[in-house]
């Protein structure tokens, strides 16, 4: 039974109402510093920890709760007579509920003007110590680190005569250990990223020790293949507009491959300003287009490769309306992603309950790092977020691209970034015409992209081509020109650039260099 609570919080969200409810249930309140003042100002009967222990706060508040009367009351096992006798001998009441959250270390170091001294002062000592004590003794002590749990605790207390069951205490304790581990991980990441010991310490992008924190969203039916197990975890600091922030409106449970492909589709479609549609199959775009509206964009994207679009993942950067929904509903689709779905669109898909509808608010946030596991290690890199501006492009051929060709080239370049290397993408009039992906030789990607367009009945005459990396030989260029391309965009940087540029001049096409490579593996 909870008779006494100690409350000390930095995040004061909902704390006054929570404390008032505890007081109304007859719980004695202990508190520290600013929290105690807040509760007292609200008219609640609260005892300062300094008065409770008979020992004042000291060292600018660094020592407040580090006292046997606090930790003895938390750590004592109620089922051990010798523990309870020790409390009685030293006049230490039990503390049955601990409500603590920590100094805002992560928010502090996120500030541009944060100094090492600022960071050090925001490393909480007493808070984690109390939290770990209470979590260790969770059989007898309820510990709350998240304001979202206030209502849960109150409801259970009211239903059980101020008592909290073991299942709830265990869940809350595991939450505490996860929280303190993440907190210490953030401190380690910060301190090991410092490149000097000056007050205004510069920071390395990559700390000497890297701690990552994710919360499990759900277990998945299986992994990439049915014999593999899997789960989906969410970054605690998932950026705005990230896939992990999805809300599923209908459909079957998401699979591992659904989530991976949905991320590829969503990241690509977000880069367009005009209404756009991206169709993904096995993490590769098989159709991308912009249009007057979502239905128009979908119709154009679907034309690129109707065969591969079967059972694909489709993403829009505009609300899906009834017209777009009716067009998409004619095909077999695994997942449909958009910022929103109109009521009429949702009604269309109500007849297809297996289709997964994911709603994600648009946002320009990105993951801090791109991660890839290797045997016994982890590769960490910055995101490939480099967007080439038209002013940065360098025309290296005798012929300049026309204004229309330049638009097509920029569109093709944007798409090529999301195609697995080696990537060759034919485009024209705001849509993909042929996509060659994932081949070991660039010339084979060029051939496949051309064949794909032929199979779809699309002409490549006057098309633009993007290559995610340089042409190592002229053979790939010869293939795309033979297919009908009149302009090419590529990074350049090959030992044979001069030979490739000469071939472009020989064919009378325009070639533009970006100076940026977009390998994707």
Swiss-Prot record:
Pfam families: AICARFT_IMPCHas, MGS
Gene3D superfamilies: 3.40.140.20, Methylglyoxal synthase-like domain
Gene Ontology biological-process annotations: 'de novo' IMP biosynthetic process
Record's catalysed reaction(s): (6R)-10-formyltetrahydrofolate + 5-amino-1-(5-phospho-beta-D-ribosyl)imidazole-4-carboxamide = 5-formamido-1-(5-phospho-D-ribosyl)imidazole-4-carboxamide + (6S)-5,6,7,8-tetrahydrofolate; IMP + H2O = 5-formamido-1-(5-phospho-D-ribosyl)imidazole-4-carboxamide
GO molecular function: IMP cyclohydrolase activity; phosphoribosylaminoimidazolecarboxamide formyltransferase activity
One Gene Ontology cellular component annotation held by this UniProt entry: cytosol
Keyword Transferase listed: yes
The entry's keywords: Hydrolase, Multifunctional enzyme, Purine biosynthesis, Transferase
EC number: 2.1.2.3, 3.5.4.10
Residue span(s) of domain MGS-like: 1-145
Comment text on domains: The IMP cyclohydrolase activity resides in the N-terminal region.
Family: Belongs to the PurH family.
Protein name from the UniProt record: Bifunctional purine biosynthesis protein PurH
Gene: purH
